[in-house]
């Protein structure tokens, strides 16, 4: 992916194919096939790899992949459309639409911060962004991955200790558009946001901490992406 980001498509294609050949489980094969598909020069080959990615995603069929189904079916539909196969294009467009809607993830969910809060407190939108202090956030963000919440806590503004709270949404929520279908297909980080409050129902203390070097790398990446937050 680093090669792809640097515009070295040929080397990126070679490495993605190597990842496919070395994949050891269905999730790895799904991800690798998806990226191999992106580097195909013709529609039939692109379609073949997209359908391969879809099959392995269907084999996995958990919350790490279901958010990718709309995009996968849509890309497959467009391939069939380009090939003049109206029936298969229509079928896959309909399948893409069938997976739209609110996420089905049941949690548990976590929110990382440096704020000192208590069980029963409500987290609400309207605070300033951890990454762009001048930006007032219209949503409250959370994740189903405790280590992701731990990273958010480490990157949060303030000098207090990192805290990861177990939270329950009090209203509907959506996939975080800042990460969904961006670097990876769908929302494998299970990152969400809501305009409704989150209720704190507990706290966890056990998650994988980032090293100072890793945190600095994250801060540098966030500095580069300033101005790109979808609010």
Q: PLM features: residue spans?
A:
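Alpha-helical segment of the N-proximal tetratricopeptide repeat
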Residues: 1-14
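Conserved NAD+-utilizing ADP-ribose enzyme module
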Residues: 81-82, 87-107, 112-114, 130, ...
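Conserved small-residue packing positions in alpha-helical repeats and bundles
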Residues: 1, 34-37, 77
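Flexible helix-coil transition and linker loops at the boundaries of alpha-helical arrays
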Residues: 18-26, 57-67
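Residue-level detector of the short coil/turn that links helix A to helix B
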Residues: 7, 41-44, 84
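TPR repeat positional signature
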Residues: 30-33, 73
């Amino acid at each position: 992916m680093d090669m792809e980001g640097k515009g070295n498509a040929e080397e990126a294609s070679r490495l993605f194919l190597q990842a496919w050949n070395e994949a050891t489980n269905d999730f790895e094969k799904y991800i690798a096939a998806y990226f191999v598909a992106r580097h195909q020069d013709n529609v039939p080959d692109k379609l073949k790899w997209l359908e391969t990615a879809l099959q392995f995603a269907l084999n996995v069929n958990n919350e790490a992949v279901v958010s990718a189904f709309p995009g996968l079916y849509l890309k497959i539909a467009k391939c069939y459309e380009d090939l003049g196969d109206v029936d298969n294009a229509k079928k896959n467009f309909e399948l893409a639409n069938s997976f739209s809607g609110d996420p089905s993830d049941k949690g548990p969910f976590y929110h990382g911060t440096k704020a000192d809060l208590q069980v029963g407190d409500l987290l609400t939108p309207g605070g300033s962004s951890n990454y762009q202090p001048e930006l007032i956030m219209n949503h409250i963000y959370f994740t189903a991955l405790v280590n992701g919440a731990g990273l958010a806590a480490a990157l949060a503004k303030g000098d207090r200790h990192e805290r990861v709270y177990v939270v329950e949404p009090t209203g509907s929520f959506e996939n975080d558009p800042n990460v969904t279908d961006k670097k990876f297909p769908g929302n494998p980080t299970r990152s969400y946001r809501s305009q409704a409050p989150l209720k704190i129902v507990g706290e966890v203390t056990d998650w994988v901490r980032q090293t100072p070097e890793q945190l600095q790398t994250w801060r540098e990446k966030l500095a580069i992406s300033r101005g790109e937050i979808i609010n």
